[in-house]
Regions:
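N-terminal intrinsically disordered, cationic/polar leader segments
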Residues: 2-367
Length: 367
């Protein structure tokens, strides 16, 4: 009987080494990568076709009990706060860098003194100096969440912006909050109520310490072409021919800068201004008598896209809480295969020599 003794007091011969090597190769040839790594990763060199790695063997089991203490956190690399030598590309100031479309429930106050909790998409950005590599974007979210339990107003948005601007040591900053605001709307004749949803955005921009508060609203309405209406009436009158004018769903994006120190412009107030300017808002609850009333309402208010821009402007100019503004209107034609569009700006805030190439394509109903 042969007994293996670990304490061999002589050097193995070459023949013994060759036999041992052959045995290891036979075993390694049938073993898995995991089995080889468990025994000794260096054995990969003995197997034809297996890659040899000098990388240490790492655990593949998630460490549930591991806790990162202060010392460990301090040891973590932070490339975004690295030296200027890490900057890639031109060393230029970046006007806006941050995060977009992080969502959370936010509580908003209504004109009737109630609160609504609405899903809100938040964009937060700051300026970045030319000599800084980058920002820690999670700080924007953390700063915003610190205020998320409060009922939001522009004052709360200002506090959130100040928090992350200080945390990121930036000069300029911006917050935009997008949400759909529900408001009850009564039908034209049947007396039924339904919820109309309005896409709003609140924007706070601070540049060189000066805040600018902006409210955006997408208002959806029906536009009946005045020319088509007259042509239809001509066919009826002159030839006894039944004809109908073309009308279409239309969207106006109303952007208003709020006057500093002015009274609160409620969401409902801006909606009311739009309804006053263009009363042919699309309906929610509709019975036959409402549909007939809507046809009559459109006939009483035919409107070109140029008219729409000017009518909205006329209403906005009457409100002392509103400073500069912009109206972007899109009549999504039922006659033509293209849309009719217009842009009207008042004041320097929204004046621009160039338009976003995708601007008009974003004027759609719903999200």
């Amino acid at each position: 009987m042969n007994v293996f003794n670990r304490d061999i007091d002589r050097e193995p011969t070459r023949a013994e080494a060759e036999r041992a090597l052959a045995l290891l190769r036979d075993w390694a040839g049938a073993a898995s990568d995991g089995e080889i790594e468990t025994l000794d990763p260096a054995l990969s060199a003995l197997c034809p076709g297996r890659a040899v790695s000098d990388y240490p063997t790492l655990s593949r089991t998630y460490p549930d009990g591991f806790e990162a203490d202060a010392a460990y956190k301090a040891s973590l690399p932070d490339l975004q706060n690295g030296p200027a030598s890490l900057i890639r590309g031109a060393r230029r100031q970046i006007q806006h860098v941050g995060i977009s479309n992080f969502r959370l429930p936010i509580r908003f106050h209504t004109r009737e003194n109630g609160d609504l909790t609405l899903e809100t998409s938040v964009t937060g950005t700051v300026s970045l100096e030319a000599e800084k590599k980058g920002i820690n974007m999670s700080r924007i979210m953390r700063s915003f969440y610190a205020h998320a339990e409060r009922t939001f107003s522009f004052q709360v948005i200002e506090a959130a912006l100040a928090s992350y601007k200080a945390d990121l040591e930036s000069f300029d900053a911006r917050i935009m909050m997008c949400f759909s605001f529900p408001m009850k709307m009564r039908s034209l004749r049947s007396g039924l109520d339904g919820f109309q949803y309005y896409d709003f955005a609140l924007e706070l921009v601070e540049t060189a310490g000066v805040p600018l508060k902006i409210m955006h609203l997408d208002y959806v309405y029906s536009s009946t072409c005045p020319c088509s209406l007259e042509l239809s009436e001509h066919a009826r009158r002159e030839r006894g021919q039944l004809a109908t004018p073309h009308s279409q769903r239309s969207v106006a994006r109303i952007s208003v800068a709020l006057e500093p120190g002015g009274d609160c412009l409620w969401f409902e107030d801006l909606i009311d201004l739009c309804r006053k300017a263009v009363p042919t808002e699309t309906q929610v609850m509709v019975k036959r008598e409402d549909e007939q009333a809507f046809a009559e309402l459109n006939a009483a208010n035919p409107i070109f896209v140029e008219d729409a821009a000017r009518l909205f402007a006329e209403a906005l100019l009457t409100d002392p809480r509103i400073g500069d503004f912009r109206v972007v209107a899109s009549h999504q034609e039922s006659l033509h295969s293209h849309d009719a569009v217009s842009v009207l700006t008042e004041g320097a805030t929204f004046a621009a020599d160039s338009l976003d190439p995708k601007l008009f394509s974003t004027l759609v109903h719903g999200r």
